[in-house]
């Protein structure tokens, strides 16, 4: 299994499983001289944490990050930064009854077919639990970009099922458990999620992520275009089934006279491209949108096969999210930060 590292100059390697003893990350390529403590990383991890509200998974992990290397006297040394988060609330017994079954919509079937073996405890390596280390690594990238480049990243939930944000108030995003920018819709979201819990079902979501202060020139055509790497990073997040940059699929119905981002002496007159042109950042805001599928771990019985090929029925037990997108905002922010950090260092290396 070789796909556990991300980036070229700013690289992140993660390891660990959903119900193993711990998860780890090695962050290599962070420049020396960045002020960094565990307190800089913890807030983003807490934003992703389960068990904070009745609307998400009730798995309760303290998720306290530990810096094991790469930092001396509160400053990065330029050597690899090792991060550790222990798993404290594992309940593998929740999966003992389905250990020989392939849960529909999960990686159980494909992992087994590829490797001939799988960790059935919550999906093992395929679990979204792994993303906590991406968030930890992303927090380092976000801090560097914010302090050294004046580049900021913020995400929010744009839609849950048919409930869409009618107004975007970014100041409201951190004030509710849904990361939702439209406070008027919060009661409707609460009702929807609680009904899904009662029904044992799930729903999809759409997230938007915005990067401001991105310098012009990031991206390496033709095979390492900035928007291509962003799309790849976002598609690597569990349950993501679609990614849009800028206007995305809406461009199908647009005319060139509308879509082209015309220029004036004051700058661009629009941003339909979402901050990149020909795979290179234009200096405008990077606009990314992600579609999350409804979680497949639900209490409604479904048809499947066991490892011997026998047709069976499965009901997924355990502690699961009615909407996996509700905890994904910090993950999407982290992945965008990792891409931009990597490309910024590559840009600096070329420019000197």
Swiss-Prot record:
Its EC number is 4.2.3.5. The keyword Lyase applies. It catalyses: 5-O-(1-carboxyvinyl)-3-phosphoshikimate = chorismate + phosphate. GO terms for biological process: amino acid biosynthetic process; aromatic amino acid family biosynthetic process; chorismate biosynthetic process. Reduced FMN (FMNH(2)). Its cofactor is FMNH2. Pfam families: Chorismate_synt. One of its GO terms (cellular component) is cytosol. Signal peptide: none annotated. Homotetramer. This is Chorismate synthase.
